[in-house]
Amino acid sequence: MVEGRPFPWGILRERMGKLAQNYQGPFLVEGVGGWRVPLDSSLGIREWAQELSLPVVVVARNSLGTLNHTLLTVDSIRQSNLTLLGVVLNDTSPKPDDSSITNPALLEQLTRLPVLSLPYQSTQLPSLPAWLTPL
């Protein structure tokens, strides 16, 4: 349910189909709240991503607890047989703590995925790494 109404799967499927017919470039489809968030009583973000068969980029906050949440998400995405391109970490605090400093390298090592770490309230994005340039 979205705002008390059934989730509009049919409309989304139709619009994504038209978009795919008319546009050859990459698609960016944003999830909400996390990989396993339900969108209605039977389907969620994971199932939507599986239906679309698009590559996945995990976006996570860079703070204490991120390792566990991100590793669980990466494992679930891999079990879903989807292509996982990498992880983007957003710094959500102006004062980095020890975990936010070590998280990027640890996640690269533990997931064997590229990790892009974005600084707190950056006004200018860094150059995109090669694994994100198709997006």
Where are these regions (language model features)?
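Active-site phosphate/pyrophosphate- and oxyanion-stabilizing loops and adjacent acidic/basic residues
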Residues: 46-47, 105
